[in-house]
């Protein structure tokens, strides 16, 4: 999430394949068909935490919904030249038809904080796994002492996307992608309620990062203006799992206007025929979608993915149900089904999302570069060679074309 959709030209792919075939080199294609990481099965890259989109399309020869692409035919034509004598490639099966679904409203709403399960009591902060939960979101709640001054709240290692509320009012959103962990607390009365809602976004699944606990994995502290640090204790912890039974079992109420805090939204649409479709999520902020009880996957407004693939076999003639857990509130609680996906619409606002906080700017005034050059266009390793030994602090790359 928050990065450009991965693509590669058919020309480059076929060129690389031909070179290996001509040299009798074994290889595999990553991906021939990427498919979809349904539900919460999307992982994350390492070492810098980079959660993977629900779509695993990867601009592959066979696209997310199983349809062949122009790139597929280029690969097929190439491979046909390397078949043993007398063999031929099999026929291409027919594609599953796609359908459009007219815009429909999700005007039944259940506010998350009004539909919490029974809490678990814990003196100290612990990770999500300590409360027998592996995916989804988790809510940590405690009360704070009185303070006449502002204080700094520090949440150490919130994995992966946290919202902080004080007496029901949202104070901040903290993203692991941006390395955020501090919030300024306003003056408050004794017993003010602190809520920290943390969403797990996908585990790093290789290398040292494979030990990727979720929730708040270390500690929560407040620091006064005179530097006194207090570790917060006595937590009520609410599991918010991702199973459909939990999402469905809510007290939904009619609500036409969008809310700006976490809530479940429910709506239905009618079909005369079924087929694959792509739910357009551009009205929604961040969350999870279920269709007819199936966990379709995560969405996030920052993109680049703006649609969710729904296989036609999970739809039915007649009434179909959609439930959405939206963590920050939609622009409008409505959606539609498209016949083509939107996988390359990056909507990151402001400065570089993953690497720069608000107010942080790189000032190179007066600095002289020790070397300036360009890379040639194309794939493969390229090297930078300095004419002499140099001392450097920054290595900057600028995209000259795309």
Predicted regions and their residues:
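The substrate-binding groove and active-site-proximal loops of carbohydrate-active enzymes
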Residues: 1-12, 16, 57-70, 304
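Aromatic-lined ligand-binding clefts that engage carbohydrates, nucleic acids, or primary amines
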Residues: 150-165, 269-292, 299-300, 322-324
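C-terminal functional regions that serve as terminal interaction/effector modules
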Residues: 200-201, 208-209, 285-290, 294-300, ...
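Residue-level detector of high-confidence beta-strand sites
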Residues: 173, 298, 372-374
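Short strand-edge motifs at loop-to-beta-strand transitions and within beta-strands
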Residues: 140-142, 179-183, 265-267, 304-308, ...
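Aromatic, loop-rich ligand-recognition surfaces of beta-strand-rich domains
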Residues: 296, 351-365, 376-402
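Carbohydrate-binding surfaces of carbohydrate-active enzymes
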Residues: 21-254, 327-330, 394
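Noncatalytic modules at the cell exterior or secretory-pathway interfaces
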Residues: 186-198, 313-326, 388-401
